From Swiss-Prot:
Domain DDHD residues, every copy: 684-878
Gene: Pitpnm1
Species classification: Eukaryota, Metazoa, Chordata, Craniata, Vertebrata
Keyword NAD: no
Protein's name in the database: Membrane-associated phosphatidylinositol transfer protein 1
Entry's Gene Ontology BP terms: phospholipid transport; protein transport
In-chain residues carrying the UniProt-annotated modification Phosphoserine: 300, 304, 319, 326, 329, 342, 345-346, 373, 382, 593, 600, 621, 894, 1235
Species whose genome carries this gene: Rattus norvegicus
Amino acid sequence: MLIKEYHILLPMSLDEYQVAQLYMIQKKSREESSGEGSGVEILANRPYTDGPGGNGQYTHKVYHVGSHIPGWFRALLPKAALQVEEESWNAYPYTRTRYTCPFVEKFSIEIETYYLPDGGQQPNVFNLSGAERRQRILDTIDIVRDAVAPGEYKAEEDPRLYRSVKTGRGPLADDWARTAAQTGPLMCAYKLCKVEFRYWGMQAKIEQFIHDVGLRRVMLRAHRQAWCWQDEWIELSMADIRALEEETARMLAQRMAKCNTGSEGPEAQTPGKPSTETQPGTRTAGTPDGPEAPPGPDASPDASFGKQWSSSSRSSYSSQHGGGVSPQSLSEWRMQNIARDSENSSEEEFFDAHEGFSDSDEVFPKEMTKWNSNDFIDAFASPTEVEGVPDPAIMATKGIEDEARAPRDSEGLDGTGDLGVEACSVHALFLILHSGSILDSGPGDTNSKQADVQTLSTAFEAVTRVHFPEALGHVALRLVPCPPICAAAYALVSNLSPYSHDGDSLSRSQDHIPLAALPLLATSSSRYQGAVATVIARTNQAYAAFLRSSEGTGFCGQVVLIGDGVGGILGFDALCHSASAGTGSRGSSRRGSMNNEMLSPEVGPVRDPLADGVEVLGRASPEPSALPAQRTSSDMANPDPDGSQNSLQVAPTVTSGEPRRASTASCPPASSEAPDGPTNAARLDFKVSGFFLFGSPLGLVLALRKTVMPALEVAQMRPACEQIYNLFHAADPCASRLEPLLAPKFQAIAPLAVPRYQKFPLGDGSSLLLADTLQTHSSLFLEELEMMVPSTPTSASGAFWKGNELGNEPAAQPAAPSTTSEVVKILDRWWGNKRIDYSLYCPEALTAFPTVTLPHLFHASYWESADVVAFILRQVIEKERPQLTECEEPSIYSPAFPREKWQRKRTQVKIRNVTSNHRASDTVVCEGRPQVLNGRFMYGPLDVVTLTGEKVDVYVMTQPLSGKWIHFGTEVTNSSGRLTFPVPSERALGIGVYPVRMVVRGDHTYAECCLTVVSRGTEAVVFSIDGSFTASVSIMGSDPKVRAGAVDVVRHWQDSGYLIVYVTGRPDMQKHRVVAWLSQHNFPHGVVSFCDGLTHDPLRQKAMFLQSLVQEVELNIVAGYGSPKDVAVYAALGLSPSQTYIVGRAVRKLQAQCQFLSDGYVAHLGQLEAGSHSHAPSGPPRAALAKSSYAVAAPVDFLRKQSQLLRSRGPSQVDLEGPGTPPTTLARGKTRSISLKLDSEE
């Protein structure tokens, strides 16, 4: 849902405005109703009493919007969905209006309005809650200074020019509001507009469109008309208005009755004639407040509306569905099955702090869109961009840092820090190469592209604010508009339809467009290389404009490219040309020597059929030289060296001074430069770290080039970037894979699934590294892959070292040449060290949609997808974290000790076919006292095997932010598998939290824990996990639910400066399960205590552990949370009843010993924030203890087995805690890393 509050000022009294408003409505309804497909029916218009606002007038209308919806979207909807109902309660000066659709049940528009005699200064006239105020966007509409769309401008409706004959008012100057505030009269319409369209892939785009065009644009024009029509209504009374309303209702009823007689509905749009109509929501929101503004003129709909949704031919329902299924029922089934998943969540899907929302709060504020409507409206009045001369103002889209200016770390950001601190707050710049859908037919609309980028920016801000606060304000997005290269191909293919000659034929609406052919035809055009050169130039312009801007001053972060379906193809070739020009991101001669024969495999001087449009259809036969099939393979391998007409048009190669890779000798050299193509100087002026493709058919294009030029090796077309990510939906007819082109055997390996954001906002623990995939699917590539894997301190399931080290590190055992050459060849051919193909979730119901509608739907879905945004942020933030230089200690990449033979021969036999279940206890030590680490090394889920007499290496991350592990020593396990390691006194650690990893020397499995060093008197809060957090009982089965608001309460105590201690009566063999549960729900980091093995008295062990904290560590426990069983434990610690909080029903005999939180954590949190505990603790400061999310992660294998890992952090937490200080790197739990880091890779 998108919420905006509009303030509309007019220089008139409230009584005058009431008459003006009602007169305007009936007049516009009369003028703009043309019948079927466009018009208004008034079903009821009667007074009411004791309703919204007291007594007023109730109106019930039906708007017919069929002719205002694009053909591709209309193909999804039945006729019933082409009507919008309006119910309005007008109790002036308060009105309330609601718009619904009889068919689209998850669509609604609600508008509340107060008309007050002021200048719009009241901050909260609707009495919104704190959460609603944070979601609300304020927007003031100025009837004089705000520009209207060029197609709607009329001089007689311009307040700057209008002067009333009867009243003498006008014209209005730009400072009219200030003058009216001093002299009067002046009134303001406060309008709170809530728009919701909760359907997959379309929500953000349609909600934004309705607000910024359907609501704001209509309200602006309607109020300009109300002012300029005052000579018509100034002498009317309310009785005259009611009479006009009744006359209008009768006239509209007669007009609609005539049109409904014998009408079959709006005519289907024909292929090849793109629609210029509006998207749904234009007339749906036609009257932004019932008695406010009816639909715009139907006779001449503004073309800019249609450009918001790229339109194509309408596809009727195919006969494959069978005659027994009606189009009406089929459409209903389609729309119901793509409703947002959040609406279909079962009770098993538990969200933190869900119960804390009021009826007016939104459960999903990540869908809220922050959007500058003034910029959008101004764009309508700006002239169309001249091809090749992009407007820098349009290209520069506002970054996330402008959307949410959260408080940041003061170090280096205020300009007063050390000189070595980076001055620019932006660490990652995203350049979006936006060309549009492959079915776009026009030259491309910059406003639509800008809206898509703004939607993506909003998604970035929402996801970052909740789960990546350390990136808030450090990411910027910029638009790079790309030429719509598929437009000519689409026009050509549309006219090749078997039914193109018969515009009235019903079969013409069938889906006869071969979607896969469009990018192939587009990239074969002689103008394609010119388009690539244009993209390179515009990208450099956008980058330079960012550097010149205030937010880009001093920028030295990473640059990431994002390309949509067509923009991805152009961006790939731009990167390939940059690599061939010697500016590859890795700077190697191998990368820099590639030429660009792949850019356009067509015959050079042949006339371009796509450029000529449909004129080629009149030819009897094409020229022989225009047929690429007539060129033999020998011609392609040995082109005419003198650059004759039969030579291939290719991009220029690098200069002769650069070495050429031997494997490229078979590729034809460039013999001539393509007209208007990239030149030697055309290259990107910056290094690209990553390139994300959104549903791009790049794989098909590369396959065509490989077919046309057999000598071309696709793997050698190395783009000048460090990594490519090919994101697509499995049901997308335009998408294709890339990995099988680089290594054919990858056709048998499924693409990696991008985790769902609702379940895994921080990733599901799956490794993205190519090396891990090669090891997992070793049977496809070689028989002895494990022989060449370098020795690493990792789990048995796979390595977490850098994937590109697999050919460079010495093997633990000698490998056969055939073994290593196959894997090294794959690693050498790969574009990066991670997987390339990634599959996104989409509803299964999309497979039943008409194929011609899918490109538009999928193209829109990427910009609002939280799955996509979270995936991108995980990759970019991982790269932004500190990296070591080559001169630093190499233990971060290479363990101090490789795998060795087991000390005991029986060990190999004992641990066969069992998985490790090692664990180490979290240790809390008072500063200055001995620091001792303890661990236990077992195998099997129930500790069936003990690791006895084996070496274990102890690593400690002494500087958690650096990710650098230091080897502290080696110990040998005893007969019970236990290990005790005293930290040497000369290496004793200071106050702080230090991750510890104990790695078994024999198989490199490991246990993890944290060593926490505190000062005397540190204050702490204790939470019993099973007693205070879980809302359901689960011993060994599915994950228990989290009590609503539990995470918020713990985070409040942590933010107040207290040490968090978690205790549980579960045995330590369940540590991985419990820790993974805490991590997935994003509980704040703390010390975790388990029972030592199975015990009949877990409460006694809890009490002993807490007593040791009080007596030995000298902690001061100020509060305890748990169940009624924990009351005695906390009482033994000396906690008073006011410090003991018990969750659940009150027990009468314990009421005097504790405080029962019968109303739940949400109410308790409000008391904490308003009470005495909201201040910082009185003990000594502990700035070194990081305020972060839970950091110790469970092994990968365990996380993968979880069937339902629920949403980790409710959005309400951010609303309650505010922007706050971003947590440190320790906030991201990690299961496996290329550098033994604990920060999340995926």
